[in-house]
């Protein structure tokens, strides 16, 4: 079963890296919860990579924060993957900037973002607090 970030957790991620306020909590909740879209027990986004991609794209494009939307989206995606035993590897800062700009300008959709994530992730042990 996939673990999902909550709206409060994503807001906390934002608060750690930006002094700017939340613009719209409902917009944030909608972006965070898109990965949970489905029918009954069947999710529209079938795996952790697709769920991280929809979180990444939704947060980046929804503009729920006054500032820091792309940074928050990237960190939330990374945390979402980590809590599901995956880790992004061998990616330069420039590649991340290019990815985020492509998403923010809608040149890259959720499916392409999921493919990018799958290409750059490896299975990693989930770290639990003692």
Predicted regions and their residues:
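FIC/Doc superfamily catalytic core
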Residues: 1-130
């Amino acid at each position: 079963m996939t673990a999902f970030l909550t709206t409060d957790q994503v807001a906390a991620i934002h608060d750690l890296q930006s002094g700017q306020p939340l613009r719209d909590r409902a917009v944030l909740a909608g972006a965070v919860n898109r990965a949970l879209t489905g029918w009954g027990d069947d999710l529209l986004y079938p795996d952790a990579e697709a769920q991280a991609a929809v979180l990444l794209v939704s947060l980046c494009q929804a503009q729920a924060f006054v500032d820091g939307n792309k940074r928050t989206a990237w960190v939330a995606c990374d945390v979402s993957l980590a809590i599901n035993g995956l880790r992004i590897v061998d990616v330069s800062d420039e590649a991340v900037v290019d990815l985020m700009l492509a998403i923010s300008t809608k040149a890259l959709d959720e499916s392409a973002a999921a493919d990018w994530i799958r290409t750059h992730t490896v299975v990693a042990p989930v770290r639990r607090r003692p």
